[in-house]
Swiss-Prot record:
It comes from the Archaea. Transmembrane segments: none annotated. This is UPF0280 protein MmarC7_0482. The lineage of its organism: Archaea, Methanobacteriati, Methanobacteriota, Methanomada group, Methanococci. Belongs to the UPF0280 family. HAMAP family: UPF0280. InterPro entries: ApbE-like_sf, MA1715-like, UPF0280.
Amino acid sequence: MKFFQEKISIKETNILLKVDNPKFFKIAKNTIINERFNLENYILRNPIFLTSYSPVEVLDNAPKIVKLMAEAGFNADVGPMAAVAGTFSQLIVENLIENDCKNAISENGGDICLKCEMDTTVGLYAGNSSLSGSLGFKLKKEKIKNGYGICTSSGTVGHSVSLGNADSVTVFSKSASIADAAATSIGNFAVGNNVDAINKCLEKAENIPKIDGVFVCMGEHAGKIGKIPQFIKTDKKEGLGNVFEMF
């Protein structure tokens, strides 16, 4: 099966999208434009939604993107913007599914939502860690056929806010929105020496519902909790923004 890839950048939203038919790129672009409009307008009326590091109650008539982000924030005890990237990826894939797309991967700064009818390997990018680019997660088609989230937070890579120093905290969940906020929340506990920091992250992860599993990487050390996909050894030294490969 042939796949098509395109980078879509609209303001701060930068999506790397892989689909089985190029007609879906236009649908994805329209989804981003519409959801950005909804989010920006809500923030204009409710600026605390943009700046809060704590969960925020939202209005009953708030748009879907706002409600998803708020729910994810409460689930992980962080501000709603901690879920923004994963929520965009999730809404894109959900909209593509509604338009009969069979295979789609949306990656937004390390926050991935995918729906595939084949086994798919997602590579790990963890900055300067020795594990970066040498490890992947093999997701079975049964797990991802209806949509799935794999989101990564880092205190050493990228511009997103993290209060910890983990090279990567990767969270697996049916919801990319939930996974994104959880990754941020868990990553905030990555303080101290590597072993202690990883243990703190895993302890925090135990108390966050709606996630399947977590993998934490700091330097030469790593830890996991819950159910995560099978590890796959890779030889691809990929950079952020090109972290997945389909088989």
